[in-house]
Amino acid sequence: MKALLAIDGSSESALALETSASLTWPPGTHLEVLTVLPTEAEWYGGPWDTGVAYVPRDELDDRLRIDREALLERAVARLRRPGIGVAARLVTGRAASVIVDVAEEIGADLVILGARGHGAIERAFLGSVSAEVVDQTHCSVLVARAPSARRILIGTDGSDVAMSAIAFVGGSRLFEASTARVINAVDVDPSWWMGFTPGDAAFTVDPYVSVVDEGRVRGEKLTSAAAMLLRLDGLDTSTVVHEGPADAAIVQEARTWKADLVVVGTRGNGLMKRLLLGSTARSVLHHAAASVLVARRAVKALPHTEGASSEPMDAVHA
């Protein structure tokens, strides 16, 4: 497995680091830790404001570079363990673009970053950098809002991308110390009663109950099948079926069950599946209090390699 952790010294990126440290990285993993120095256009309004009237740009660059190099060194020390390689990289540029480009360059299976960073224009619930990275990368992305991933809630609707999310959780071997729960939501399509009015004989509660019951039976089958796959991969897994829109059901269950991490596929069976990121995944990403993993494809852990060891930090300046 190849993974990219993006950090910037913010409290949110500290959660991303702690989440990364909590994962059970399989032997042979290559983990790259990245931090991005801001361009001149991004300096204004940032937390690196010194509070003095004027500081030469070169001096500010030097201060921030020293700070970020120390940040990388601490992060690599936190993540290093036998059997995995950990490297560091420092790049100057536009944060979201650099993260996407480096993920592509190293062939990352997973990108991990905080929900919000140091940018001056970060939005309230999801930062502009993390939102863009989720939209633009071709691999799975974990947006961290919690320091671990011990309790994992996984949404499924039976679609291929939902099954890829299930396969990612089990096949990656990242969550062997975790407990999982699979959720399905019965969201009744109103098209079955369109054309009727409350006065029509056909407009009764019975059809609605029947549709909900059928949906619940289907949901129980879907969640049971997914749970069986996860149990085969060694995860203690339970199931639950909710009634209502999938995004609201997932966010509610994550709160009630106290999930650390919510896992969703990029698209489901909804009408908006033509979008790069499906409506359910986007809503959960913006509104869940837990970390969110947007899974794009399954990945299998590499078999253990004899003699595998951690690599020393190799800071790359660009």
Language model feature labels by segment:
Residues 1-56, 82-87, 149-209, 229, ...:
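Small/aliphatic-rich secondary-structure junction motif
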Residues 71, 99, 166, 218, ...:
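Fold-core signature of tandem repeat domains
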Residues 7, 90, 115, 156, ...:
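Conserved residues at beta->alpha junctions
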Residues 53-70, 203-221:
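A short acidic, glycine-rich active-site loop
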Residues 12, 19-22, 38-41, 55-58, ...:
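Structural beta-alpha unit
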Residues 9, 63-64, 87-88, 118, ...:
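A generic structural signal for short
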Residues 2, 12-17, 22, 26, ...:
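Gly/Ser-rich helix-loop-strand patches that form or flank binding pockets
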